[in-house]
C-alpha cells in the first residue's frame, strides 16, 4: 500500500475511504490539507482556487460552504481527494448543514468534515450526532470531526471530548499549537495522544486567518503541529481570496516533508 506522499491522480481515483486513511497514516505527519472557501472569487483569473492550492502542494482539498453540483467532475479535474465541510446547525444555509438531504448531495466527496464556521455555535454532542448521520447516510466515507478554531468560543476542548470524537470518527480536528488562545504545544500534544489512543488520525488546523500570515510564521505553526504528533496539517481558507496564501502552502509543505516530497506533489 502506498503512502499519500507517493500517490498520484490515478492512485487517488482508485482509492476507497479505508485506503485513503491508511495512506495518510503511513505518511507520518507529512500530509497537507488545504481548505477552499467555495463562494470566494478566484485569486488568479482563469483558474479556480482549488487548482491553485493543488499546484502549490495540497494532498487533500476541503471545500467550505460548497453549493456546487458537479463534485465528481471537480475531483477528476483536480486529481486529488476532495472533502466537504458540513455543520450540525439549523442556523446555517441548507447547503452547509449536516442533514441527510445535503449529505446525499455531496455523496461523491472522498471525506466529510463535521465542523463549525464562526457563525455556527456547535458543541460536541451535535457533532457526535452529525458523525452518526454521516456514517448512516454515506457508509464507507471517512468522517473527520472537530473545530478548526473557537467557532465563537474561546480556548481548547478537553481530552474527554477529543476522545469521544475520536471514538466516533476517523480523524479529529485539533487547533494547531499557536493558533487559538491557550493552544500550547504540550497541551495539543496531549490531545493528539488522546485521539490516537482512541484510534483516530489527527488533523492539526490553522484556521484562524494565520494561514495568511508571513511564511516564517506558517512554517513555525506547521512544525509545531508535527512535533505535537498530528497526521495532517490543515491550512484554512482565510488567507487571501478564500484560500491560504499559495506561497504559504509551499512553505508549510517544504517544512514538514522537505523539498523532495513537496516538489513531487506539485508535479503529480
Regions found by a protein language model. Give the residues of each.
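C-terminal helical cap(s) of enzyme catalytic domains, especially alpha/beta-barrels
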Residues: 71, 238-265
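Active-site beta->alpha loop and helix N-cap motifs at the rims of alpha/beta catalytic domains
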Residues: 2-12, 36-159, 164-185
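Catalytic-face loop-and-helix region of soluble metabolic enzyme cores
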Residues: 171, 175-244, 255
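Surface-exposed amphipathic alpha-helical tracts and adjacent flexible/coil segments at the periphery
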Residues: 2-8, 261-268
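N-terminal basic, low-complexity leaders that serve as flexible interaction/assembly modules and, when applicable
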Residues: 1-34
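Surface-exposed amphipathic alpha-helices with a cationic face
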Residues: 17-28, 54, 71-78, 127-144, ...
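Short, glycine/charged-enriched secondary-structure capping and boundary segments
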Residues: 49, 127-129, 187-188, 217-219, ...
Amino acid at each position: 500500500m502506498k503512502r499519500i506522499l507517493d500517490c498520484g491522480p490515478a492512485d487517488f481515483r482508485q482509492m476507497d475511504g479505508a485506503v485513503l486513511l491508511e495512506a495518510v497514516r503511513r505518511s507520518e505527519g507529512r500530509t497537507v490539507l488545504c481548505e477552499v472557501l467555495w463562494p470566494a472569487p478566484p485569486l488568479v483569473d482563469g483558474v479556480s482556487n482549488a487548482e491553485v492550492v493543488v499546484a502549490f502542494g495540497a494532498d487533500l482539498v476541503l471545500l467550505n460552504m460548497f453549493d456546487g453540483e458537479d463534485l465528481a467532475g471537480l475531483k477528476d479535474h483536480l486529481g486529488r481527494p476532495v472533502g466537504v465541510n458540513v455543520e450540525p446547525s439549523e442556523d446555517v444555509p441548507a447547503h452547509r448543514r449536516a442533514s441527510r438531504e445535503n449529505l446525499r448531495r455531496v455523496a461523491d466527496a472522498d471525506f466529510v468534515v463535521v465542523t463549525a464556521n464562526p457563525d455556527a455555535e456547535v458543541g460536541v454532542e451535535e457533532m457526535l450526532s452529525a458523525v452518526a448521520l454521516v456514517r448512516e447516510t454515506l457508509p464507507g466515507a471517512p468522517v473527520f470531526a472537530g473545530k478548526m478554531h473557537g467557532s465563537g468560543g474561546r480556548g481548547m476542548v478537553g481530552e474527554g471530548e477529543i476522545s469521544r470524537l475520536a471514538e466516533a470518527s476517523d480523524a479529529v480536528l485539533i487547533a494547531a499549537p499557536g493558533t487559538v488562545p491557550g493552544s500550547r504545544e504540550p497541551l495539543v500534544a496531549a490531545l493528539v495522544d488522546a485521539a490516537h489512543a482512541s484510534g483516530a488520525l489527527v488533523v492539526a488546523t490553522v484556521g484562524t486567518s494565520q494561514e495568511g500570515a508571513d511564511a516564517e510564521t506558517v512554517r513555525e505553526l506547521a512544525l509545531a503541529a508535527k512535533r505535537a504528533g498530528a497526521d495532517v496539517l490543515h491550512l484554512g481558507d482565510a488567507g487571501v481570496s478564500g484560500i491560504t496564501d499559495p506561497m504559504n502552502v509551499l512553505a508549510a509543505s517544504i517544512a514538514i516533508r522537505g523539498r523532495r516530497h513537496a516538489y513531487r506533489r506539485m508535479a503529480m
